């Protein structure tokens, strides 16, 4: 690292909860928070796996006083990966979302890599050169369920060279509407549902949000054993049918690990004024245009190992289910079979459930018939087993 060029970023995390403290008479906004600042945030890593794609999410921070905490995408920037031989690999933001992506690359794992960013207003940023870290394979991803459902990961490095690890994951779960009907409505007509128009089975996907890091440095062997990565509380609807989790593992340098550790402590351990005090967060990205400007992010160069598991609800012990039809009271309407397939209910908040004889149609609330009202999509993921 270039010790003279580190930028010190003060994160006053405890201020976030000051208004909730009973004994606080007024809110104190320190100058660093009250000032109009917009710091560059670079989230991502250089993927050194074979034929791998590298992506960086680049945006700018907002102040605590802003109405939203969502970052502002940094658009129309020029972003490149550089190696120590001067070769440049360009990343582009084709969707206009601030996510810059490379073409598939196979980088020399013996080299070192950095990124260069030039924003639309001409400001230039660069990271320190990062050595390549080869991530060892995941030994196993498994789960235990004495009550809550928890997913664990185990790994080891037989060369005893890694010691520092980071994890993230993506959860996908299958969920049904509260009421499953063989009928749907398309363009005002009753139709028998099939895989092209059904609204009763959905799949939702969510990324991890916690910072998950582990270290074997204190141990005699480079082993991570049964590290918990995700927990689903007892009775959560994520495992009403089938659940899947894709766990990803990244090797880190000690500097990168220390960076993520500070972020973890700052973001997860605060709660009162007596918890973690403002933290000095040192990244490895620098503003060349204005060396005093803080930049948030740490660039690593490493490969990725991943493993997916599937869990059926029937695998679990005494898993609690909420009543699926709670609040789904039905009504009946007279239906003239000669008008089939037209469907024009007086109350548009209801949809077709089933026919109770040739002239009676039972209706249910639309929110009970449509799984997408609870999130997700009716398009089955390509990796789903059936």
Residue spans for each PLM region:
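Bacterial N-terminal signal peptides that target proteins for export
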Residues: 2-11
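C-terminal motif of bacterial Sec signal peptides marking the signal peptidase cleavage site
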Residues: 19-23
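A sequence/structural signal for flexible, mid-protein segments enriched
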Residues: 25-386
């Amino acid at each position: 690292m270039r010790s003279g060029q580190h930028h010190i970023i003060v994160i006053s995390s405890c201020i976030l909860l000051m208004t909730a403290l009973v004994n606080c008479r007024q809110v104190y906004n320190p100058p660093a928070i009250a000032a109009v600042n917009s710091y560059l945030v670079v989230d991502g890593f250089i993927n050194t796996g074979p034929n791998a794609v590298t992506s960086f999410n680049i945006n700018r921070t907002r102040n605590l006083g802003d109405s939203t905490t969502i970052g502002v995408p940094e658009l129309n920037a020029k972003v490149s990966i550089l190696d120590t031989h001067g070769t440049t690999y360009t990343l582009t933001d084709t969707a206009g979302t601030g996510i810059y992506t490379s073409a598939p690359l196979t980088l020399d794992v013996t080299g070192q890599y950095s990124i260069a960013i030039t924003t639309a207003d001409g400001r230039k940023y660069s990271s320190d050169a990062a050595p390549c870290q080869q991530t060892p394979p995941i030994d196993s991803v498994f789960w235990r369920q004495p009550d809550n459902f928890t997913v664990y990961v185990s790994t080891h490095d037989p060369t005893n060279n890694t010691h520092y690890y980071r994890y993230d994951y993506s959860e996908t779960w299958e969920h049904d509407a509260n009421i499953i009907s063989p009928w749907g409505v398309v363009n005002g007509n009753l139709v028998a549902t099939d895989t092209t128009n059904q609204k009763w089975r959905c799949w939702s996907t969510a990324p991890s949000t916690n910072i998950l890091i582990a270290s074997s440095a204190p141990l005699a062997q480079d082993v991570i054993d049964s590290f918990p990565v995700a927990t689903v509380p007892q009775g959560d609807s994520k495992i009403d049918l089938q659940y899947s989790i894709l766990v990803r593992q990244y090797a880190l340098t000690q500097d990168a690990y220390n960076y993520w550790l500070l972020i973890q402590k700052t973001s997860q351990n605060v709660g009162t004024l007596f918890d973690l005090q403002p933290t000095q967060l040192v990244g490895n990205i620098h503003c060349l245009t204005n060396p005093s400007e803080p930049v948030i992010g740490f660039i690593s160069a490493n490969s990725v190992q991943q493993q997916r598991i599937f869990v059926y609800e029937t695998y679990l012990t005494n898993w609690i289910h909420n009543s699926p039809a709670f609040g789904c009271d039905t009504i009946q309407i007279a239906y003239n079979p000669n008008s089939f397939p037209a469907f024009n209910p007086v109350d548009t908040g209801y949809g077709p459930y089933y026919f109770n004889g040739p002239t009676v149609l039972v209706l249910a609330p639309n929110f009970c018939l449509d799984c997408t009202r609870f999130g997700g999509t009716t398009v089955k993921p390509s990796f789903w087993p059936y």
